[in-house]
Amino acid sequence: LRRYPRTKVDLQVDSRAVNLVEQRIDLALRITNALEPNLIARRLAACASVVCAAPAYLAAHGTPRRAEDLAAHNCLTYNYFGKSLWQFTRAGADLSVPVGGNLSANESTVLMLATAQGAGISLQPLFAAAPLLAAGQLVALLPDCQPQEMGIHAVYTSRQHMAPALRALLDFLAEWFACDPGWLAASAAAGAPKAPGRGPGGAAERRAKTA
């Protein structure tokens, strides 16, 4: 908005993927690997995840050494992704691990706060968990397993007659993911590739109307 001060954005945050046409949404940001075929998507970046727990939980319940050990732990799960099965890659092979626990939610921030309070183990987006990991409030687990990577996509309905404000927003998002130091640090920590763009950069959804 500082770059284009005459532009107005109506931002809505939701855990559900809504119908862009019915809701008159110009653009949605979705973290998912399952995009609707009737929509146009521009991949902005990769979203790495980390299995983590608070030191207090690990002191009370022990530290899982293998992904299969998660079955014996209280795993806090996200309603729209990985509610009962977490997907990993280990030594180049795909691995699916059944998980369960006493708390599930449709918002990952709720799960992260509960995890930091010692409620259990959760699978969190690395960019969100990084500050708590750095502060020692959370501990990264299972270093030999890479959780399934998700794509971050800008989703819209048509390339025809695209408003200049929408085009500018798309280009800005691509540039931000390509250049933001915090995002690049999280990507580097996960070994994730840089997102394409200019410069040196059931699904959560952010959606916007531009004017």
Residue ranges and their predicted role:
Residues 1-40, 188-190, 194, 209-211:
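Central regulatory/effector-binding core of bacterial HTH transcription factors
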Residues 9-13, 77, 97-107, 145:
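Short beta-strand-to-loop elements that line the ligand-binding cleft
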Residues 15, 31-34, 53-55, 124-127:
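Beta->alpha turn/N-cap motifs
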Residues 27-30, 120-124, 140-141:
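Paired acidic/hydrophobic, glycine-rich loop segments that form the ligand-binding mouth/hinge
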Residues 38-49, 53-76, 91:
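Flexible hinge/capping segments at coil-to-helix
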Residues 41-44, 135-147:
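Short beta-strand->loop
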Residues 112-137:
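A ligand-binding cleft/hinge motif common to bilobed small-molecule-binding domains
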Residues 126-135, 145-211:
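C-terminal effector-binding regulatory domain of bacterial HTH transcription factors
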